């Protein structure tokens, strides 16, 4: 995997929902962005904030050498990003991570795409690429409330889409686990499952598909270096009774088969 660093230029930025921002960047690094589910590590342009921030890639446009990121303002670093304007530059390291494996599904087959909250953005590029292969995509997307929901129309344009909110203000009342359970009860069995979101959601998916060979989970561990050097983002492997075997989410992931890791 190629890993490069570049000062990329901000092309546009806008707010999608409370604390949710869409950031478009332009630069040569985009040439190396190919697999959905990869991320970049962004240096905060402030001297007292040393650690880079990992943000997943939402869309890739090779023809214009642009990529789109969607992030949520969580602290001082992302607060700085939210104030930046078109024409300014950011120090970007990437692309990082292994990305989703889309080779296991073929045209005419069905993929469930499951996302929650800020885990939703990388699934858009995934859905686009699966569509291009002729795979039928069915989206299951969960939000805290209607107020913080975003990208509904974009996903609906790519395929069948089901929504859920914690408070019932939009879509089904509850989480995406409920939506998946209802789909399975109707006999809808996917050829592959792709998911990104909070650990609780991923655990629910793991329990719903305990023996499925093609369930891919994007883990949201905290990352410091982004290149596998600091061991801050490790998780343990299934089948390891010693507890000594682990994988580095930033370098060997962030996507793993559900059968590989302990959530």
Curated annotation (Swiss-Prot):
Gene3D superfamilies on file: Dihydroorotate dehydrogenase, electron transfer subunit (2.10.240.10), Nucleotide-binding domain of ferredoxin-NADP reductase (FNR) module (3.40.50.80), Translation factors (2.40.30.10)
Cofactor: binding details: Binds 1 [2Fe-2S] cluster per subunit. Binds 1 FAD per subunit.
Superkingdom of the organism of origin: Bacteria
Cofactor: [2Fe-2S] cluster; FAD
A GO molecular-function descriptor: 2 iron, 2 sulfur cluster binding
Biological processes annotated in GO: 'de novo' UMP biosynthetic process
Keyword set, alphabetical order: 2Fe-2S, Electron transport, FAD, Flavoprotein, Iron, Iron-sulfur, Metal-binding, Pyrimidine biosynthesis, Transport
InterPro entries per record: Cbr1-like_FAD-bd_dom, Cyt_c3_hydrogenase_gsu, Dihydroorotate_DH_ele_sf, Dihydroorotate_DH_Fe-S-bd, Dihydroorotate_DHASE_ETsu, FAD-bd_FR_type, FNR_nucleotide-bd, PyrK_electron_transfer
Pathway: Pyrimidine metabolism; UMP biosynthesis via de novo pathway; orotate from (S)-dihydroorotate (NAD(+) route): step 1/1
SUPFAM superfamilies associated with the record: Ferredoxin reductase-like, C-terminal NADP-linked domain, Riboflavin synthase domain-like
The UniProt record lists the keyword Transport: yes
Binding site for [2Fe-2S] cluster: 225, 230, 233, 250
UniProt KW Iron keyword: yes
Domain (FAD-binding FR-type) ranges: 3-102
Binding-site positions, FAD: 53-56, 70-72, 77-78
Complex formation: Heterotetramer of 2 PyrK and 2 PyrD type B subunits.
Job description of the protein: Responsible for channeling the electrons from the oxidation of dihydroorotate from the FMN redox center in the PyrD type B subunit to the ultimate electron acceptor NAD(+).
Assigned protein family: Belongs to the PyrK family.
NCBIfam families: PRK00054.1-2, PRK00054.1-4
The protein's name: Dihydroorotate dehydrogenase B (NAD(+)), electron transfer subunit
Gene designation: pyrK
């Amino acid at each position: 995997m190629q890993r490069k660093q570049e000062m990329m230029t901000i092309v546009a930025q806008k707010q999608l929902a409370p604390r949710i921002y869409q950031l478009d960047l332009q630069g040569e690094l985009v040439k190396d962005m190919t697999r959905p589910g990869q991320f970049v590590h962004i240096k905060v342009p402030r001297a007292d904030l040393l650690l880079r921030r990992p943000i997943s890639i939402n869309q890739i446009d090779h023809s214009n050498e642009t990529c789109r990121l969607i992030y949520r303002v969580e602290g001082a670093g992302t607060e700085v990003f939210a104030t930046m304007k078109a024409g300014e530059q950011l120090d970007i390291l990437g692309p990082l991570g292994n990305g989703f494996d889309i080779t296991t599904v073929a045209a005419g087959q069905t993929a469930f795409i499951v996302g929650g909250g800020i885990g939703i953005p990388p699934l858009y590029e995934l859905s686009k690429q699966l569509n291009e292969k002729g795979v039928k995509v069915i989206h299951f997307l969960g939000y805290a409330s209607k107020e913080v929901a975003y990208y509904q129309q974009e996903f609906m344009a790519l395929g069948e889409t089901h929504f859920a909110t914690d408070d019932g203000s939009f879509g089904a009342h509850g989480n995406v686990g409920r939506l998946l359970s209802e789909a399975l009860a109707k006999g809808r069995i996917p050829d592959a499952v792709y998911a990104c979101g909070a650990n609780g959601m991923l655990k629910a998916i793991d329990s719903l598909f305990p023996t499925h060979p093609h369930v891919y989970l994007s883990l949201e561990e905290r990352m410091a270096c982004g290149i596998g050097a600091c061991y801050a983002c490790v998780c343990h492997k299934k089948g390891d009774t010693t507890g000594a075997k682990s994988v580095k989410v930033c370098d060997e992931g962030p996507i793993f088969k559900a059968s590989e890791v302990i959530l």
